[in-house]
Amino acid sequence: MTEINIEFPDGSVKPFEQGVSILDIAKSISTSLAKKAVAGKINGALVRLDQAINENVKIEIVTKDSEDGNIVNWNSAALVLTSAIESIYPGVHFGEIGNGEHGFYVDTDKVDQQISVDQLPAIEDKMKDIIKSKISLKHSEISVEEALASVDGDPYQAKIVKRNEKNGKVSVYDVDGKIIVSDNVALLSTSDMKAVKLLSVAGAYWEGKSSNPMLQRIYGTSFYKQKDLEAELERQKEAHERDHRVIGNNLDLFFVDPKVGAGLPYWMPNGATIRRSIERYIIDKEVKHGYQHVYTPVLMNLDAYKTSGHWQHYREDMFPPMDMGDGEMLELRPMNCPSHIQVYKHHIRSYRELPIRIAELGMMHRYEKSGALSGLQRVREMTLNDGHTFVAPDQIQAEFKKVLQLMVEVYRDFNITDYTFRLSYRDPANTEKYFDDDEMWNKSQSMLKAAMDDLGLDYVEAEGEAAFYGPKLDVQTKTALGNEETLSTIQLDFMLPKQFDLHYVGADGEEHRPVMIHRGLVSTMERFTAYLIEMYKGAFPTWLAPKQVTIIPVKDDLHGAYADKLREEMVDKDIRVEVDHRNEKMGYKIREAQTQKIPYILVVGDNELENNSVSVRHYGEDDSKNEASADFINNIVREIESYSREND
């Protein structure tokens, strides 16, 4: 039989007979590896263990203890779930099945009624029965005609057949007699599946379009070991407690009502106060660092986005243009860059003015599908803390360092400590997809690297991750829920200044092309607020808290006037304070203030009235201490002004 060469991750190459499977290769290495193996990768693509190999390739063995191993488990559990549902509710229709960051999901459409969360235990028990039976998850590729016949009567599966067709074939699984269309990679059988849990039911539009039917999406998770499932359930419990949507509702920060517009949050007074505090902080900080704040329209002529390239590259993320009837087409802006370019172009610029730093809390709109929307994290209307600096080429490195130092300063004030830097370069093996200027790329990438080294900052380098118009620095962070996201970005742009024909007059009296630096310190107000809600678990530091102090009179008729006097003194110092005059028991008022996570609870009674003092209780503490009212006010003012990051 013909031999083929198999390359392993360490670079070694071994010959095998043509037609060898991933499992065969694992067995040839060691019995223990074969027992741990659940899938493989061929030239980076995930494949089943029984995948035959007929040519020279590079492979990896995917084991149970890897991220890809979890994905294979989740794909398998999703298939088992379809079989379990079918056995309990014959005739049910199936939409998408897939995996997410922490588990799997299956979309269903039960014709006579919806599947509710109360029905999950019975479905889960059936899944466990199927898993214990150690059935095979039989995979095959069949013709489109066979696939359509297998899913006859299920309109969603029929559409998936047509969508997944490749060269006249469709990938399907037979799970205990139930045929399901899926390209996902699954286990050979259920024998390695040890722990499964169904978690919730939610609505999901078919294909993510609000004009399509609403299906029931069943979420679950599964693992190879029970202890891993228990750890995940504990993580999810913590995630729920930190979920900004849950906290946002409990603390009355914001709400989203699909009836008046999905992805369009309403900021309630508490949430608006937090946002306003962030915005004031950002503006003051940027002004101190030489930025000129502007206001620019949320509507712009479509031609500007054609010039910038947004229309060509990001049209699917933009709302449809508005035809004004006179040939003018207006567009809700998805980016602020063209607006700030117009500010720059409004005057003739001299080299003496550079760098010119323009900033704005700019409202933008993105065409997000309903299924992608989530609280404040994914919205259709957002306000970006955006900044654009126009520099001469020899100013790039110095300005890049200044922006980076500003970012680090902001992170410190918000107590953000868990972040990493990623320098993104163009792919040297595929330069065609980038702005065509080799000298520019080489020089600018070297400048950014030198700036990071000068500042003594650790970073990773990522080839192929640059924007098409220039290299960039991404600041990556882990949210309180363990998800990685980009907190801030600095991007060099050599293309837009050319597209919009930007100039400055140099010392030689000639026109020169500036370089544009895009930067966002803290992303959008919506996403950053969500990040902070989850990071602080709703217990904001005093300077950000919507209500910083609540004053509770022991007896309102005797101590209410003193409480009001204290309130007036604090309001004069810009402290956010309220007096609880309600006819409720003091213990109830204290518990409610703690539930609202107000940093300071002040109780005033006879002793406090007589001594002009307050009884102070910090959030999260059971004990109180007596303090002169003037001292308390002075201390909290200092705390607020210094962006104190602890409520103590």
Swiss-Prot record:
Its cofactor is Zn(2+). It comes from Pediococcus pentosaceus (strain ATCC 25745 / CCUG 21536 / LMG 10740 / 183-1w). The lineage of its organism: Bacteria, Bacillati, Bacillota, Bacilli, Lactobacillales. Homodimer. This is Threonine--tRNA ligase. It is found in: Cytoplasm. The gene is thrS. One of its GO terms (molecular function) is tRNA binding. PROSITE patterns: AA_TRNA_LIGASE_II, TGS. Its main location: cytoplasm.
